[in-house]
């Protein structure tokens, strides 16, 4: 009987570190819920001590997630461990993930300690974390470049101290599959208490070998793989979990292991991560790319028509890609839209049918037939909209030609008031943005603008993703419409609402921080 490989997702921790603009608490919760639906065993959702915002998001997710174990990261520092435990204690099940550098380079140049001191710190921290939970993971940072004798020593010591999972990261993506698999084999051969812990791996993709190294580790006995959806992460990224999961599924004959993943949720979860993180998936990306199941060669097309297995080692249906069965138009009712959403894997609890249907009718009136990619885009935007937005775009008009400077008139509602402003700019989008900035008086700088067609043809929806800078922080905005000027305006308004909410949260967090400090002072006195 095959053994299970635990899937540990760190999209919301290691993956988010690569984003130009941090996710909001609501966006992080959406990602976490998608990962839960996909069936990940453990999700690492943040570094609680790093900021009040991270603490809040970890605590919020820990409170909401019921079917996956929620994990928080902590250095081998007492305060880190205590804060992580405080954020996680509301969870159904939680894990504290400790990490400490072990390579000679890191120990000497970064920590400036002896290896004996490093082992002592690790043991102390594992024991402290065990006071809060029996599920403690310890990571040997830069294990791929750690002398094997030292690695075996600290692994044995931390298992003895109570760590249930030992993670072996290839932190800088330095090793090759043969070499990395050998490291895992050495641990099984030379650590006497290795049977008392699960060996995990966490590989980075600097040399393009993260997935290969993870598979080699599984073959050598590792039973947990850490990574992110779509492989997002620092530098060249992390192990792409969807690739490891499907490699295990397709090559069970070779690997003789399995996962608890709901494979039909893979594509949808990949899209959620791509959309919310504003990181498009390359067309040639394995498993989830647009071309993953496309065949352009005549010979290949003929072979697929005769038997799909000629050129497909897995079917698109396995990861949740289904063929269109209904043509949706403005005459389609709520039941038809709901049915199609269910076929695509969406539950009604994940979106508002009334709001989605209203948006569907408006789009259907404009373009006639509405396709799956249109519905998914509408559902995504619908999910992004707060129940009560502070700013609302009421109206805009643009005059532009190749000979004259562009002029825009905009009406923006906030509260019970509607404000109007006109402005000129270097093109219609710039003019609209200048008018919006004049109304709100927010010192916003546009850093990134990206337009993506959500579908095919001239009537395709255009999604605009922007990154703006405000008071030293970056914020993401997204807009969707068949008119790219409208979607550009909506993206800016969306970013302004995100900024406004962040300001309100910041004010509340500062108030709570001042209140807690006041209490601490009273207790000290």
From Swiss-Prot:
The record's listing under InterPro entries reads: 2-IPM_HCS-like (IPR050073), 2-isopropylmalate_synth_dimer (IPR013709), AIPM/Hcit_synth_CS (IPR002034), Aldolase_TIM (IPR013785), LeuA/HCS_post-cat (IPR054691), LeuA_allosteric_dom_sf (IPR036230), LeuA_bact_synth (IPR005671), PYR_CT (IPR000891)
Q: Which GO terms describe its cellular component?
A: cytosol
Biochemical pathway: Amino-acid biosynthesis; L-leucine biosynthesis; L-leucine from 3-methyl-2-oxobutanoate: step 1/4
The organism is: Sodalis glossinidius (strain morsitans)
Q: What is the name of this protein?
A: 2-isopropylmalate synthase
Residues recorded as binding Mn(2+), renumbered to this chain, are 14, 202, 204, 238
A Pfam family recorded for this sequence:
LeuA_dimer
Query: Is this entry keyworded Manganese?
Result: yes
Residues annotated as domain Pyruvate carboxyltransferase: 5-267
